[in-house]
């Protein structure tokens, strides 16, 4: 999941610090999520999707 969020940020020119500001999370939490070092909680995922203005199923594949 984190890799997909990172790929989205990279492809849209969005910095992790911007996402941290928009979600209220620390830079280190966003970094850990993007690197796959932290499992994302439901509330965190919701806030990330809301900040990026994407639907909740955006980062899910049919396989997930």
Q: What feature does the model see in each segment?
A:
Residues 53-64:
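Short C-terminal boundary/hinge segments that cap the last helix of small helical domains
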Residues 14-32:
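Short alpha-helical DNA-recognition segment
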Residues 9, 20, 49:
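The alpha-helix within a helix-turn-helix
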């Amino acid at each position: 999941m984190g890799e997909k969020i990172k790929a989205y940020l990279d492809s849209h020119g969005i910095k992790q610090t911007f996402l941290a500001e928009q979600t209220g999370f620390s830079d280190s939490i966003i970094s850990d999520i993007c690197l796959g070092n932290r499992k994302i909680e439901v509330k965190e995922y919701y806030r990330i999707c809301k900040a990026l203005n994407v639907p909740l199923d955006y980062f899910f594949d049919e396989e997930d």
